[in-house]
């Protein structure tokens, strides 16, 4: 895209995107006395990790919870400026809506909770499952059927994941979700068949702010940052000239660029034919989240449940989450708040009426299920996440490796979940930014020493 030519503002380090990975990158640059500027396209910082308040309800963009594996608590996260006393650790309770029952998640480790005859069918299918495929060419669908049996795969695992990622699973590789998907662990599956409860999975506990929603994480990361510019939508990049042009015609020149914007979008505006071609093989799903405030407490059957997976293809949404079961600071005690997620393709979003068409369908489906009374609905706030889940197709790894290697030649370093085109947690995104920036700084210092 051709953009107006302005005198570039020369900045040694430019950070694209003001989400948690971009803010982490900026924080590390500032702490290391590096001159930088962060460019965020929206009016506020935070990316998808933002919170808004509507009618005394505190809504995140959708359910965003802090899962930690490297650090013991939020206060231990480097550069985040978080105080543990402002956060609550929650032991996850999630369920799967199958057979008109709420089955504890992960369902594959809790088969005994299934009603008859589904339980017997799943067990028989598991006992007669095909051999687990080690071939790297195996699809995600193959992985599920060989790992858990065809009945459970068809009942829950396949429809749930296809609704979420808006793509047939035979187009994804078995590496699609890596550590985020409960493994076909025979010991745990058989324990579940015997009725021994399991709360397995990577996120058996998580952290959430006592007040203020997940934007408390953003507030900690941005605290004290000096060079964060909002309303700076980058519309053109010249990798050869190392310049970025924003929609309001500001031009920035960099020595090093750290980008948290979706990798596919970065390549498409790069003016590099090789990058544009490689990015054409990358795909992703979108998510539309409906945040709903209710003038009533949650129904008793939802007591203590944090989120609920919904595999039934006749129901428009794939997950329902309950903010008010997670943090009481999300609404007043006499009310409740939930979020409802619908998967979509990027092509679906081209239909301008999509969100308006979906909203009444979602509300009516919730009422038909008996999960709310439409008369209790106080407000609905919809958010569209254009890039929600990146797809681990068989082409993804080769394409991403080529792209990252090529970008490095221009001193461009992608960071975070969407920058690196991966399926990662918030902790992973911050760690990706931290490691990438530190490595770039160390390389630059080594180069200066060698030059001297």
Regions from the language model: what does each represent?
Residues 117-243, 253, 260:
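Active-site/ligand-binding neighborhood in enzyme catalytic cores
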Residues 21, 44, 264:
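Conserved Rossmann-like nucleotide-cofactor binding loop
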Residues 11-38:
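N-terminal Rossmann-like FAD-binding beta1-loop-alpha1 element of flavoenzymes
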Residues 3-8, 51, 106-107, 304, ...:
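Conserved flavin/dinucleotide-binding core of flavoenzymes
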Residues 30-53:
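Glycine-rich FAD pyrophosphate-binding loop
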Residues 55-132, 179:
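Dinucleotide-binding Rossmann-like beta1-alpha1 core, especially the glycine-rich loop
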Residues 235-351, 364-370, 449:
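Mid-domain catalytic core of redox enzymes
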Residues 17, 89-91, 230-233, 238, ...:
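Short loop/edge segments at beta-strand edges and connector loops
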């Amino acid at each position: 895209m051709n953009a107006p030519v302005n005198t570039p503002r020369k900045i040694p380090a430019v950070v694209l995107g003001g989400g948690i990975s971009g803010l982490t990158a900026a924080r590390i640059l500032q702490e290391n006395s590096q001159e930088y500027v962060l460019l965020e396209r929206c009016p506020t910082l935070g990316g998808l990790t933002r919170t808004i308040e509507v009618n005394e309800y505190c809504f995140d963009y959708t359910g965003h919870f802090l899962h930690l594996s490297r650090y013991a608590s939020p206060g231990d996260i480097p550069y985040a400026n978080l105080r543990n006393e402002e956060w609550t650790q929650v032991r996850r309770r999630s369920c799967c809506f199958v057979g008109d029952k709420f089955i504890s998640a992960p369902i594959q480790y809790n088969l005994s909770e299934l009603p008859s005859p589904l339980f017997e069918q799943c067990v028989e299918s598991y006992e007669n499952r095909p051999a687990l495929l080690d071939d790297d060419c195996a699809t995600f669908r193959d992985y599920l059927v060989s790992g858990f049996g065809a009945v459970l795969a068809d009942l829950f695992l396949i429809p749930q994941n296809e609704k979420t990622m808006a793509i047939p699973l035979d187009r994804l590789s078995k590496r699609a979700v890596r550590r985020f998907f409960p493994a076909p662990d025979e010991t745990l599956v058989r324990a579940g068949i015997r009725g021994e409860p399991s709360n397995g999975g990577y996120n058996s506990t998580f952290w959430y702010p006592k007040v203020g929603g997940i934007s408390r994480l953003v507030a900690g990361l941005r605290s004290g940052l000096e060079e964060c510019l909002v309303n700076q939508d980058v519309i053109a990049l010249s990798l050869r000239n190392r310049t970025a042009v924003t929609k309001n015609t500001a031009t920035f020149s960099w020595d090093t660029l750290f980008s948290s914007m979706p990798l596919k979008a970065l390549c498409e505006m790069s003016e590099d034919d090789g990058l544009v071609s490689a990015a054409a093989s990358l795909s992703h799903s979108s998510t539309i989240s409906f945040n709903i405030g209710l003038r009533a407490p949650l129904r008793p059957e939802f007591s203590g449940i944090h989120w609920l997976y919904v595999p039934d293809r006749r129901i428009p949404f794939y997950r329902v989450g309950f903010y008010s079961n997670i943090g009481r600071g999300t609404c007043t005690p006499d009310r409740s708040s939930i979020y409802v997620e619908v998967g979509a393709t990027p092509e679906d979003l081209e239909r301008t009426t999509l969100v308006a068409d979906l909203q009444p369908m979602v509300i009516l489906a919730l009422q038909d299920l008996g999960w709310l009374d439409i008369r209790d609905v106080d407000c609905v706030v919809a958010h569209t996440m254009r890039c929600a889940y990146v797809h681990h197709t068989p082409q993804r790894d080769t394409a991403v490796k080529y792209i990252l290697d090529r970008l490095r030649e221009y001193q461009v370093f992608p960071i975070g979940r969407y920058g690196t085109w991966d399926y990662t947690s918030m902790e992973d995104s911050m760690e990706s930014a931290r490691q990438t920036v530190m490595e770039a700084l160390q390389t630059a210092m080594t180069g200066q020493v060698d030059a001297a």
